[in-house]
From Swiss-Prot:
Pfam families in the cross-refs: eIF2_C, GTP_EFTU, GTP_EFTU_D2
Stated name of the protein: Translation initiation factor 2 subunit gamma
NCBIfam families: eif2g_arch, PRK04000.1, small_GTP
Residues annotated for Zn(2+) binding in this entry: 58, 61, 73, 76
Amino acid sequence: MVASNQSEVNIGMVGHVDHGKTSLTRKLTGVWTDTHSEELKRGISIRLGYADCEIKKCESCNEPECYTVDKKCDCCSGKVETLRKISFVDAPGHETLMATMLSGASLMDGAILVIAASEECPQPQTKEHLMALDALGVKNILIVQNKIDLVTEEQAVENYEQIQKFTKGTVAEKAPIIPVSAHHGANLDVLLKAIQEFIPTPKRDETVSPRLYVARSFDVNKPGSEIKDLKGGVIGGSIIQGILKVGDEIEIRPGSKVVEGNKTKWVPIITKIISLGAGSKKLKTALPGGLIGVGTELDPNLTKSDALSGSLAGIPGTLPETLEKITIRPQLLERVVGSQDELLIEPLKTNEVLMLNVGTSTTVGVTVSAKAEKVEIKLKLPVCADSGDRVAISRKIGSRWRLIGYGIIL
């Protein structure tokens, strides 16, 4: 079964701030993903941005010139055939927004690490983003050496060698390095060919109970709308397994926070799928892969301003329990990356405050007990997760949260 309107793979666009991730996404998709007023004002990505593109190929022309995202071949203006539709997840590169990048990494089947040829490599967040991909198990990586139009050939070669040295011994050691100018659209055909070769569509199991990682949630109603015209809340994210259909009843966990006296509990939300969409296309059935919007019967107050981002959605009764405490087996990095002085990472201690990313969820927790092989953490915001899931671990160093490793939930 093929949903031709839907992307089949999610590719993260990651790297240091201002290295050209959003510009490259726009060149490939035609969509400028910095759409929030604060982002436009500051010129940086603050939230995760999403955009789709279709990789097409002309049968008449030679490789790599035959690859394009346009309706006609760039070389001969001839007919093109669509090979695959992909979704890009544009992650913020600013160090203060690392939590957003980590929550986006759980949606990524592969990643493009964008490195500007016009700056020394590696820059702090170039390092931190590569470590994050490694920590969260993203293995299919391409490197784009961007802004080659701003440097001489000698500088480009020197930067290329710096990239090779930086990636040696990392998950990106064998990643192709593709020189590109996003501004001029140079070498995009080579990049598209590499995406086809090095970031395959993962095998998905469509027969099991569906699970949707929720990365965004919205109220799509305009202020002053008539009551009869109001639409239910919308959640956006990616199905990691199974299939969702219009009309399905779904459960969203952890759900709503309910305070009774001195006690707080989390109650799962049950709702019905009213509509499914991928980009501007409507779907009746949504498959794993790509980013989708799910229209629901929920009160829009529950979904506005990303209130449900970090949740897990699925068929009622099939989701993991909501956890207010987790036990993990930690795997710490040797040194702190992303800061100028790369300090040695000390073992986790009891009563330490940590930031954790589980799926698309970001939460803070306090270690209740800390041993080398087993750490128990009480969470401020609960998560819905299974044993075996990966958790990114960050520690506050100075005034910033820094990635220090990952853990596996026991």
